[in-house]
C-alpha cells in the first residue's frame, strides 16, 4: 500500500512537470497487483529509484520555478519599460504636433512675407521707373539750360560788338563835332552824315534795348529753370533717400525671413534626427 502511495506522488510530480496534464491511477490498473507480487528487496530498490527520480524532479521543478521567477521579473521590467516608452511616445507625438503647428504658422508667415516682398518689388520697380523719368527730365533740363547759357553768351558777344560799334560811332560823332568848325563849308554834307549817324545810333540803341529786353527775359527764364532744377534736385534727393530706405527695409525683411526659415528648417531637421518618429503599428514614419 505504501508503494502505491509513493507511485501516486511520483505521478503527481510528473503531472505538474508536464504542465498540469491530468495523470490518474485507474482502479483497474494492474500496477497494484504487480507491486504486490514484488519481493521486499525489489520494492526497496524500486522505492529508492523512485526517490531518486523524485529528487531529480524536485530539482527540475525548483529550476523551473527559478526560471519562472526570472521570467516574471523580466516581464515586470518589460511592462514598466513599455509604460515608459508609451509615455515617451505620447510626449513625442505632442511635441511633433506642436512642431507641425509651428511649421504651418511659419509657412503661413513665409507666404505673407513673400507677398509683401512681391509688393515691395513692384513698388521698387515703379520707384525706379519714376527715378529714371526724373533723371531724364533733369538731363533735358540741363541740356535746355546749356542751350540758354550758350544763347546768352552769344547775345553777350553781340552786345559787346554793338557796344564797340556804338563807341566807334560816338567817336566818329566827336570827330565830326571837332571838325564841324573847320568844315562849315561842308556843313550840309556833315549834317547829312550826322543825321545818318544819329539815325544809325538810334537804330543801334533800339536794337540794344531790344537785345537787353531779350536778355532780361532769358535771364528770368534761366532763373525759373534754375529754380525748377533746384526743386527737381531736392525731390530727386528725397526720392533717392526714400528708395534707399525702402530697399534697406526690404533687404532686412528678406534676411530676417531667410534666417527664420533656416532656423525652423534646422530645428525641424534636428528634431527628426534626434527623435524616433517610427510608428509601432505600421512600422513607418509617423
UniProtKB/Swiss-Prot annotation:
Region forming the signal peptide: 1-19
GO terms, molecular function: single-stranded DNA binding
GO process terms (BP): double-strand break repair via homologous recombination
Glycosylation sites: 156
One Gene Ontology term, aspect cellular component: Smc5-Smc6 complex
Presence of the UniProt keyword Glycoprotein in the record: yes
Region of interest (Helical), ranges: 61-235
Keyword annotations from UniProtKB, A to Z: Coiled coil, Glycoprotein, Signal
Keyword Iron-sulfur: no
Extra remark: The DNA puff II/9 proteins have a proposed intermolecular coiled coil structure with possibly intermolecular disulfide bridges formed by numerous cysteine residues in position D of the heptad repeat.
Name of the featured protein: Puff II/9-2 protein
Organism expressing this protein natively: Bradysia coprophila
Gene transcribed to yield this protein: II/9-2
